[in-house]
Structure formats: structure tokens, C-alpha cells
Amino acid sequence: IMSLGIHRIWKEKFIDWMSPGQYTKLIDVASGTGDIAMLFCDKTNHTGDVTCIEPNLDMLRQGEKKLKKIKKIQWVNATAEKIPIDDNTFDFYSISYGIRNVTNINDTLQEAFRVLKPGGRFMCLEFSKINNEILKSLYENYSKAIPLIGKFIVGNDEPYKYLINSIQKFYNQEELV
């Protein structure tokens, strides 16, 4: 609701940019309920394999239930900082809307490159600060409204305050790279 549905378009473009071939392997970290995994499977005509890493067991269970018909997805309850997977296993590593929530970003990145095959691709989709002054002003005003909208729609503004604060405190694109 808060992104006005644009986050779905970003996820689809993310997979398009990834451009996975058939029979490729993806590890999707901070998978949530598996949106990226589902899009990856669709893009590879269900020939690609996906391992979803999700630290929240309730979220993982929702994803398993939602995508139970897709047999090419394996679910693992683990954190981004300690992935119980062998080295050099995946063609792609994805993390969408999750890297700003990890406990230790250096450990997360080390794990990412450990599980990627040589030549594998690290893919990160994340909210970040806006550098364009005109858009920045619009975004800042919208950010003030998001918790109010959240409180009106779901009766709780705290998750939306956290979202805005975590985006503001996180690295910008250049700092992350």
C-alpha cells in the first residue's frame, strides 16, 4: 500500500535485470513469503532452483504455504549472516528490501560471495536515500505521511515509522557499493 504498488514493478524489473537462464540457481535471502522466488521460477520456466533463506519462521511458513505448488523452491530458516549452504553453489544471490535490516552487513556480504559460484551475480533491491533535490523534498513529505496512513489502514504506525527511520539511517547507493 505504501509504495502504491510500485514495489511489485520493481521486483519484476529486478528479475528482468537479473536475466536468469534456464537451470540456474538462486539463493534469495530475507525472502519473506517468496515473491522473488516465484518470479525467478516463472522467468526460468520452472527449470531454475531457488533456496529461500528467511530468519522469521512465521514468514517462512507463509511462503511455504503460498508457494507449495512450486517444487523448485527450498526453504531454510537462517539469517543472512550465517547461511548453512556450501561454498560456490549459486549463480545468483538476491536480497530485496532486507539488507538494511541485517545485524552485520559485512558478515552478510561475506556470506553472499561465499555461496556464489565464481562469476555469480549479487543482486540487491533496496529502498535508499534520494539525491535529487526535487524528488527528495517530495519523498520527505510523503515519508511523514506514511506512518499516519499505516495507522489509519492497519491501526499501527510503528512498523511504518521503523521503515522510514531504517531507510534514512541506511547507506546511500554509493556508500553501499
What would you call each of these model-derived segments?
Residues L4-T24, L39:
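Conserved alpha-helix/loop element of class I SAM-dependent methyltransferases that forms part
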Residues E81-Y93:
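A short acidic, Gly/Pro-enriched loop at the edge of an enzyme's catalytic core
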